[in-house]
Regions:
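C-terminal "cap" of GNAT-fold acetyltransferases
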Residues: 3-7, 140-167
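Conserved acetyl-CoA-binding loop-helix of GNAT-fold acetyltransferases
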Residues: 94, 100-113, 139-140
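Conserved active-site alpha-helix within GNAT-family acetyltransferase domains
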Residues: 105, 117, 129-147
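Conserved GNAT acetyl-CoA-binding A-motif
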Residues: 115-127
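A short, internal acetyl-CoA/4′-phosphopantetheine-binding micro-motif in the GNAT/acyltransferase core
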Residues: 90-99, 127-128
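Short amphipathic alpha-helix that is part of the acyltransferase structural core
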Residues: 1-35
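Active-site rim helix/loop that mediates acceptor-substrate recognition in acyltransferases
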Residues: 25-52, 59-61, 67-69, 78
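A conserved beta-turn-beta hairpin within the catalytic core of GNAT-like acetyltransferases
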Residues: 65-89, 99, 151-153
Length: 167
């Protein structure tokens, strides 16, 4: 298969004509519990779709929130009185047959670019141990990694976007 296939990344909202196709792919890749969890509706949510030849072949969902209180039971992290924010990737996947073509990397890069525009301090993602392709992708992109445990063993990935000295 030609690895130079063309694809595009776009943000979707529930009123987008391709929303049903997006939801179907999220469900097919078993990410609906993260992508559509009502808890995350209280935050700014972003749904990204990778399209190739008019079809959705990959997705990424992230929220923007304060670092600390929402999933770590920790007070917000502040520097010089300013609360640091992060883009937290909650759901991500690429259809079988479209992997290893740069689609996942492009989705991650788009999320990182948006996080920078939103003034986020970092991008963070947690992934269960059963997703080695995601782990390799994140490590290849330069994310730091740390083992952690929740209901299952998992890995936390963090990509710093700016130092605390940057305003």
């Amino acid at each position: 298969m030609n690895k130079q296939q063309h694809f595009s990344i776009e943000e979707l909202t529930p009123d987008h004509p391709a929303w049903r196709e997006f939801v179907a792919l999220v469900n097919d890749l078993n990410q609906e519990g993260w992508a559509f969890n009502p808890y995350f509706e209280q935050f700014s949510r972003y749904f990204l779709a990778a399209k190739q030849d008019g079809s959705i072949v990959g997705f990424l969902m992230f929220v923007v929130w304060d670092i600390g209180p929402h999933d770590r039971d920790h007070p917000p992290i502040q520097i010089d009185g300013k609360t640091l924010r992060e883009a937290k990737i909650l759901a991500f996947g690429v259809k079988d047959g479209y992997r290893r073509q740069g689609i996942g990397t492009a989705l991650q890069e788009y999320a990182i670019k948006q996080a920078k525009l939103f003034g986020c301090y970092q991008v963070r993602s947690v992934s269960g141990e059963n997703h080695p392709e995601n782990h390799q992708l994140k490590l290849a992109m330069g994310f730091a990694v740390e083992p952690m445990e929740r209901d299952e063993k998992c890995l936390a990935f963090v990509m710093p976007l700016k130092s605390s000295k940057e305003k």
